């Protein structure tokens, strides 16, 4: 379905007369929006679907437990989560350079204050994903060896960073 979306966008870009020619800055913004939707969608999935489902699966004594989620779903979802976070930030950085400057936006230059705020929030969120959430999820999912105490701490830390991203 993602590939079909790209194909349809390419067809629209080639067919619609208003576009006229291939436009890298507009493509970058489009990719920024698509990757941002993917990132935030997965963020909401983790916070509002997977985390509560894991708790229910742990409490369900007669059920299959949370193993399938932890073994098959979470690693794949976390891969898309990390990659969409990186793609969102990188395409956003390129788009910022096209509208007045990457550094100017981060410095809240006149006319770039709101986009600069968004850039800072996105940067904090990216940091949370790669520096806090992902290393702790590796412990939780057994990708990185950790004691039971370290896993308990990792669950709390990852959850707080993820919830912070929901607020941002």
What are these regions (language model features)?
Residues 1-168:
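Polytopic transmembrane helical bundles with strong interfacial aromatic enrichment
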